[in-house]
Regions:
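Sequence-structural signature of the catalytic-core scaffold of metal-dependent phosphohydrolases
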Residues: 2-3, 8-65
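N-terminal cationic leader/targeting segments used for protein routing and processing
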Residues: 3, 473-474
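Active-site-flanking segments in enzyme catalytic domains
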Residues: 20, 40, 46-52, 64, ...
Length: 474
């Protein structure tokens, strides 16, 4: 409560008392694996004594590598212990949430802040925001499946490949299929080390231990909270309102709806890595092979950059990757209209495009150089301009890019009404009006057909009206 915060230093010193010797508390709780524990303790001690922990000297780089390997072993040990000893000491919680190992390494003021944050932490997985510990718990409980590995194999691909390769027997395969801890370990082995490092952002000096040197911004202001995530997701969806929809058949009302396509929204799962970092990662656009499942986006739990900008970047990546996934190997075949095929065609042949001025062509050329010739990166940058600027009424894109964006990432009705004053959009808006009218007419016909047959109209039809028009009342 706020009373304790008001008490300030007396409360702080009480917390510091509880945090004294955090490393011992953590290692005692971890229990059995004495070699790892002893070695980790020595390495942490050596790391604390360094004057420059980011040094590129060989011995320092080696120490960081050893600490990194041991940290992940320890994370696995501690996770397993929490299943058996539910009374988790606060330093252990701080380790699992934030990568905290030692009050002096963290800086005493930071340690107190982390303590208060860990104390107030609750499980938010029901609304799709996970600390990494809660993410592993969701996998352990079978609510989520492990992420794909670097060879794009999900857990079941992987164990079947092991069986085919003769590494495991049929009985072992069966056991692994339903072994929750094996699934957790798959995530710990494949996803965690990679993504923890990428989100941290400074790859060459990476070390997963929470350290005062990495806190380049006040912890409270960089803390990624559920309310910040929800607010930003809401802001993006107010502009690109169809970002997280998937085309689908209405399986729940298949007898009534038949082959009628509908669109369902799957908001991404947000996973927060135990570090202070600068990058977000769009880790998966779908779960395993199921298209109708949430994507996975990952941030540092303390994100030093502007969260909305990073989030918008990831949403652009998500749109690109999902379109590629849905289109398969025809993702860049322009005879089949899609976001990726039209954008690919635009960048590939921009020099010959009569709709672009010489100046616009020059801009594309220099942007492409800056994006190291990556079409995806070009798209993501245009997407960010679309959401952050054009959606706010400030045109920045060229005519061709704007048309592609308007077609595949349309604005909702209220923004379209605002843009109607601007002649740059008039042709696009006219075309959209026709398309929306056709879509709504189709749904009207469907609705009347159902009503005439005394069949209740599924609520998915109402939702589809919103998908088509971007209007809550159409």
């Amino acid at each position: 409560s706020n009373d304790s915060a008001e008490a300030g230093s007396s409360g702080d010193s009480e917390i510091l008392g509880k945090l004294a010797g955090s490393l011992n508390t953590i290692l005692d709780y971890a229990g059995s694996d004495l070699d790892t524990v002893t070695s980790f303790r020595q390495h942490v001690h050596a790391y604390k004594l360094l004057s420059d922990r980011a040094s590129q000297d060989q011995d320092v780089a080696l120490l960081r590598r050893q600490l990194t390997e041991e940290f992940y072993l320890l994370y696995s040990l501690l996770f397993t212990q929490t299943l058996e000893q539910p009374n988790i000491p606060m330093p252990v919680k701080m380790f699992l949430y934030f990568g905290y190992v030692d009050e002096e390494l963290a800086g005493l003021k930071n340690a107190v802040t982390l303590y208060r944050m860990a104390e107030a932490m609750s499980d938010h997985s029901d609304i799709g925001v996970y600390t990494f510990y809660d993410w592993l718990m969701a996998i352990f409980r079978g609510k989520k499946s492990p992420s794909r590995n670097e060879f794009d194999q999900d857990y079941s691909d992987y164990i079947h490949k092991q069986k085919v390769g003769g590494n495991i027997t049929d009985a072992e395969l069966k056991a692994l299929e339903n072994n929750p801890m094996a699934k957790v370990n798959y995530e710990l082995r494949n996803m965690f080390p990679q993504v923890n490092k990428i989100t941290f952002g400074r790859i060459t000096t990476f070390c997963p231990l929470f350290c005062a040197d990495d806190v380049l911004k006040d912890l409270e202001s960089s803390y990624v909270t559920v309310s910040r995530v929800s607010q930003i997701l809401e802001e993006i969806r107010r502009i690109d309102y169809t970002a997280f929809y998937r085309e689908s058949l209405d399986m729940e009302h298949i007898d009534v709806m038949g082959k009628e396509t509908i669109h369902l929204e799957y908001l991404p799962d947000i996973i927060l890595m135990p570090n202070v970092g600068i990058r977000g990662v769009m880790w998966q656009e779908i779960e395993g092979k199921r298209r109708n499942s949430p994507g996975r986006m990952v941030f540092s739990i303390f994100h030093l950059e502007d969260l909305k900008t990073t989030f918008t970047h990831l949403t652009g990546e998500f749109r690109w990757e999902l379109c590629k996934r849905v289109q398969g190997n025809r993702w860049n075949d322009v005879s089949i209209s899609s976001l990726t095929s039209e954008y690919f065609d635009y960048i590939q042949f921009y020099r010959k495009n009569h709709d672009l001025s010489t100046e616009a062509k020059e801009k594309v050329k220099s942007s492409l150089q800056r994006a190291k010739n990556s079409f995806k990166e070009m798209f993501v940058r245009d997407y960010m301009i679309w959401v952050l600027f054009e959606g706010a009424g400030s045109p920045r894109l060229n005519k061709v890019a704007r048309q592609i964006m308007f077609t595949y990432c349309p604005f909702p009705e209220d923004i379209c009404n605002t843009l109607a004053q601007n002649p740059l959009y008039s042709e696009l808006l006219d075309r959209r009006k026709i398309k929306v009218a056709q879509g709504l007419h189709h749904l009207d016909v469907l609705t009347r057909k159902l009503q005439n047959g005394n069949i209740p109209v599924p609520e998915t039809v109402e939702q589809e009206r919103y998908y088509i028009s971007g209007s809550k009342k159409s």
